């Protein structure tokens, strides 16, 4: 009996702990939801005539907060409180989310986030959840415009002025209201662009997907700000005081010149972020967008601390993320190996510490200092976390000037290696890389489906290599892995791109994988009507790679917002407490004591406190986080298996595996190649009706916008008219578009 007491006690303890954890998570979810809903409802109720003004007057006069503190409490504190609670939620949740059949619904059901409602147009593919969000914002804007219009008309009736002055007054109050709506848009503007945002991790929306929300909000915000400025300019022209007023810088009240500077910076960012400019002149867009610093600082000088506190919460979270990214990106990262495939695609294997965690659908930002110290480019990770603890791989397609320079740099390395110049470190070309990330989904959602359809266009196959590797490793090691049927649909232009298949060796990862995973790969070569002689073996060719010397022995830094939950939570909480403390102490011991009343100066002090709190309090956490990284990295490195030059952990297959590898299914057994045609997704989805039955099917698309639109349109049509015994397809996009 004694032999069974410990396991039983352990099981009871684990069950009790699970109940406590679930209860705490449920409580935190309820509290965060209540705070968010209350905050949004309160913002909507601020517009009626007297309610908002009366509340602000009451709180600011009856408490120690004052006007600035009251505005900060109403508009910014809810975001910061939700962020703090979100960090606690993620700490309690743990590192990994395991999907099992018990957690998955037995019957297919619609999901708001994966059902495409709009599949074409200016918004691209829009899910039902996103469509609801657009509707809520639309109602919010219409309601605010309506409420402010009523207030403007009521205000005009109170003043008996000449018709000319009446027009000027109407323009000025309209401009004031439009500026206020623009500020309310800015409350949300910086939340999606924070790459390691705790809020994005909470709702499991990756940064590459959230950027579209930033784009939408940016257009709306700048539209309101532009109309705001236009109303005032027209009014000043009517008065004949344009030059006099536009260069005024008032000590008390709104400082106009800083507002003009902020608006000009915003307009430059807005114009260069339009799709045509961004696509054809990305560097112009990228460098111009650094004017966000001018935009924010001069906005604070324009409106002062009182109004700037409305948008302070989102901007503060962005500054937190930006500082952490700066700290991570200062470290140079070793390139373990580099390889060029026949199709021109480059593969880089980068060194990473064993304690860095990421999901198969992650991506990184890469800088190569020999090419540019300013340019950072996003690339999907092609390796699985289970491929090895010490490396991460990316595939880079040569498309523009930066990637062409990288290809030339690798060519120089090949030549230097062939000429035996690598013996002299001073003579051979170098590749000095810096990395930000990894970023991506908080949970590996590809493991949430028993049935997967992976649709790729060209280099979009890269993240699917990571997915396949992740699934195969889990099947081989007996880990929790829900997917059992995977269909890969890959459209490419030429057969040269088949060489990308050499990036993953499926039989060597999981011998006899066909007994554990039903895998089909359908390849469509659109610009060739028939195969070339070498096409049958191109995927088997192993191309030589350059082994680069470990110049500094450095791997990627774990100082990332998506990294360790405890440290990222401490970074957020301590920095937030430090910011509020600095603002409070500054108000008590400086502003009130010395009777500081200049609006623009108080706005500058407010921004200074935001930056200083991140540098001082956040920097202190970063120092200890960095020390923890070194200690845990050394411990894990000593306890891990050795790594070969390609960055892969040594794996010794058994005799049965070796025999299996010799007679294992060839790639042709699960790969079908079609020439001169494009994927017919309606036929593909209909063919799965009888094969898979009534199940949930996760469809992940990585490719150009036209591919996403085509797939989303077929999924929407199939989902609406599907029979009860047919699969329900869930649309997921994994395409990155800045």
Curated annotation (Swiss-Prot):
User: Binding positions for heme?
Assistant: 214, 228, 289, 302
Which positions are annotated as binding NAD(+)?
437-440
Tell me what induces its expression.
Answer: Down-regulated in shoots by copper deficiency. Not regulated by iron availability. Light dependent expression.
Molecular-function annotations in GO = ferric-chelate reductase activity; metal ion binding
Q: Which residues lie on this side of the membrane: Extracellular?
A: 50-71, 147-212, 313-334, 588-602
Catalytic activity reads: 2 a Fe(II)-siderophore + NAD(+) + H(+) = 2 a Fe(III)-siderophore + NADH
Q: How does it sit in the membrane?
A: Multi-pass membrane protein
Keywords, ordered alphabetically: Cell membrane, Electron transport, FAD, Flavoprotein, Heme, Ion transport, Iron, Membrane, Metal-binding, NAD, Oxidoreductase, Transmembrane, Transmembrane helix, Transport
Subcellular location per the Swiss-Prot or TrEMBL entry: Cell membrane
Read off the Pfam families from this record.
Answer: FAD_binding_8 (PF08022), Ferric_reduct (PF01794), NAD_binding_6 (PF08030)
Q: What is this protein called?
A: Ferric reduction oxidase 6
């Amino acid at each position: 009996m004694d032999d069974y007491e410990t396991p039983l006690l352990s099981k009871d303890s684990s069950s009790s702990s699970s109940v406590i954890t679930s209860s705490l998570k449920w409580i935190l979810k309820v509290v965060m939801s209540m705070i968010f809903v209350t905050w949004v409802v309160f913002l909507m109720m601020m517009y009626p005539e007297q309610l908002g003004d009366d509340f602000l007057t009451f709180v600011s006069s009856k408490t120690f907060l004052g006007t600035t503190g009251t505005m900060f409490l109403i508009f910014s504190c809810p975001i910061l409180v939700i962020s703090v609670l979100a960090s606690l939620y993620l700490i309690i949740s743990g590192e990994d989310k395991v999907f099992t059949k018990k957690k998955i619904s037995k019957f297919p059901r619609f999901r708001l986030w994966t059902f495409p409602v709009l599949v074409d147009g200016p918004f691209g593919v829009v899910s039902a959840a996103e469509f609801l969000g657009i509707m809520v914002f639309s109602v919010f804007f219409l309601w605010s415009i309506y409420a402010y219009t009523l207030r403007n008309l009521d205000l005009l009736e109170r003043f008996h002025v000449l018709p000319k002055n009446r027009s000027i007054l109407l323009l000025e109050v309209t401009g004031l209201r439009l500026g206020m709506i623009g500020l309310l848009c800015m409350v949300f503007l910086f939340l999606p662009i924070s790459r390691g945002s705790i809020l994005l991790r909470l709702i499991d929306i990756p940064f590459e997907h959230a950027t579209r929300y930033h784009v939408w909000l940016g257009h709306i915000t700048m539209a309101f700000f532009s109309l705001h400025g236009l109303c005032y300019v027209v009014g000043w022209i009517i008065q004949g005081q344009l030059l006099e007023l536009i260069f005024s810088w008032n000590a008390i009240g709104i400082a106009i010149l800083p507002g003009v500077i902020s608006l000009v910076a915003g307009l430059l960012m807005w114009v260069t972020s339009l799709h045509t400019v961004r696509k054809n002149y990305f560097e112009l867009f990228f460098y111009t967008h650094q004017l966000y610093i001018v935009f924010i600082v001069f906005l604070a000088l324009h409106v002062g601390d009182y109004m700037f506190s409305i948008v302070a919460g989102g901007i503060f979270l962005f500054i937190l993320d930006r500082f952490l990214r700066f700290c991570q990106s200062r470290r140079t990262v070793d390139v373990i190996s580099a390889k060029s495939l026949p199709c021109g695609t480059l593969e880089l294997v980068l060194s990473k510490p064993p304690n860095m965690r990421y999901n198969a659908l992650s991506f990184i930002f890469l800088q190569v200092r020999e090419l540019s110290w300013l340019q950072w480019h996003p690339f999907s990770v092609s390796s699985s976390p289970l491929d090895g603890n010490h490396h991460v791989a990316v595939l880079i397609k040569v498309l523009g000037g930066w990637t062409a320079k990288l290809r030339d740099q690798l060519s120089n390395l090949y030549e230097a290696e062939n000429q035996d110049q690598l013996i002299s470190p001073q003579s051979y070309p170098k590749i000095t890389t810096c990395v930000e990330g990894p970023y991506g989904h908080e949970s590996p959602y590809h493991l949430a489906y028993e049935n997967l359809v992976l649709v790729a266009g060209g280099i979009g196959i890269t993240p699917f290599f990571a997915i396949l590797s992740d699934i195969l490793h889990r099947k081989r090691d007996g880990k929790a892995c829900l997917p059992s049927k995977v269909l890969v649909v890959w459209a490419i232009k030429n057969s040269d791109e088949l060489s990308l298949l050499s990036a993953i060796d499926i039989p060597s990862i999981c011998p006899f994988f066909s007994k554990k995973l039903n895998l089909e790969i359908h390849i469509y070569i659109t610009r060739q009507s028939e195969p070339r002689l070498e096409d049958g073996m191109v995927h088997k060719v192993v191309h030589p790679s350059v082994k680069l010397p470990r110049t500094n022995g450095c791997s990627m830094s774990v100082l990332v917002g998506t990294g360790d939950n405890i440290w990222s939570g401490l970074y957020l909480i301590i920095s937030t407490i430090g910011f509020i403390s600095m603002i409070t102490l500054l108000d008590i011991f400086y502003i009130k004591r010395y009777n500081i009343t200049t609006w623009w100066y108080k706005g500058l002090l407010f921004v200074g406190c935001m930056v200083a709190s991140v540098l001082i309090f956040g920097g202190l956490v970063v120092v200890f986080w960095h020390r923890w990284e070194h200690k845990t990295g050394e411990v894990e490195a000593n306890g891990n298996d050795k790594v070969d030059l390609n960055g892969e952990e040594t794996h010794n297959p058994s005799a049965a595996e070796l025999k299996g590898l010799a007679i294992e299914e060839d790639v042709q057994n699960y790969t079908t190649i079609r020439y001169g045609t494009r994927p017919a997704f309606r036929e593909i989805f209909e063919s799965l009706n009888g094969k898979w039955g009534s199940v949930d099917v996760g469809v992940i698309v990585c490719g150009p916008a036209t591919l996403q639109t085509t797939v989303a349109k077929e999924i929407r049509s199939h989902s609406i008219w599907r029979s009860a015994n047919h699969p329900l397809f869930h649309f997921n996009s994994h395409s990155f578009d800045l």
